[in-house]
Amino acid sequence: MILYIFITTLTIALGCFVKNSRCMQTGQFGNPYVRNYHITNNGNTPKTKQTVQITSYKKNHITRRQGQNALCLFAIFIILFLLSALRLEVGNDYGTYVDTIHEIYVGGYVVTEPLFNAVSKLLCELSGGENYLLVFGFFGFITIWLFLKILYEQTENFAMAFFLFMTLGLYFRTFNTVRYYFALAIALYSYRYVLKKEYVKFVLLIAVTALFHKSVLVVIPLYLIANYTWKKWQIAIMGMGAVGLVIFQDLVMKIALELYPSYKNTIYLENGEGVLGNVLSIGRCVAVLILALLCYKEAVEDNKANQFYFKLNLMSIALYICASFLPLVGRIVYYLMSSHILFIPSILGQIKNEKKKKVLQILVVTAGVLYFLLFLKTATQDGVRVLPYKSWLFYEKEFLNAGEIF
């Protein structure tokens, strides 16, 4: 736990030095600089002197700010990547993945998606033998890089977005179900295509990602619905649909198991998550809803991206309450509520009243710290199990039995 607190504090401190300006977000290399040209009028009129400012960009010039950003981002990436890649027996399904990678390597039967299988097989072949550590490291590298890219390019306040990424536990959860969190990172990246209404690119990207984790396919209808301007009668239909999930639970469950048969006859069906099992996540969504409503006029109403995030949050609450009977409904909702790391900084950035902005920032930071402490308290429980942390640097044991309890 102390290690996680230290890593979180260190990386957040580094993140505070990253300033992602609009110029950088649009891909311009070099901040604008100004040259002053003095023009003197020597005509018949009295002599005058004017100064003309010409703003331009040096495309191949790296400014001090960009250098600082690059250095801090690189340091953050290395710290987070090493913590992920060096872990051993950390993660709720670590042993299951070890067994799966073994079966992939020897040509056995696995239920994982084809592109994940192909990449895992290739990595093992390149390393000269069965090497699940390399597979974990590879997906950790790509996933962390994607999240940092998203936070830098798709937010106006990297420091706040990264703070939420760490304190809401999203980074540490990537130690579990590496396929899922890789798919989640790409789903967040796809926001840029949804908001620009580049739907062909969006669908193609998600379709390819589904070859790593097919659950990501649910974002196609959900994101399209969230990006659509809702009319009152459509809201009524969606409300009836939410109620229908509760009334026709058995039918919905049957359809869900046909689409995802790997959950049949598993502990997930026996235990079920339920509303109480997701009370912390529901509370988080409600808190974000309250923040959005407090700033709706100035931060959400006329902001296309924030409208999109606002609807994703509403859908998260509805699914948590009305579809809690579904196995691992949290995985579906996480594709929606992970937008909080972009939504909250965007809301705060739109507030004009400095006093109100400062108060809300303090409340958000306080809530983030408390949420992180609650996350750490549950980090040893089944379904999370990212604590205690162990590294293969200090243990000779490499290969695990998937049925072993850590």
Where are these regions (language model features)?
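Terminal, non-globular segments
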Residues: 1-406
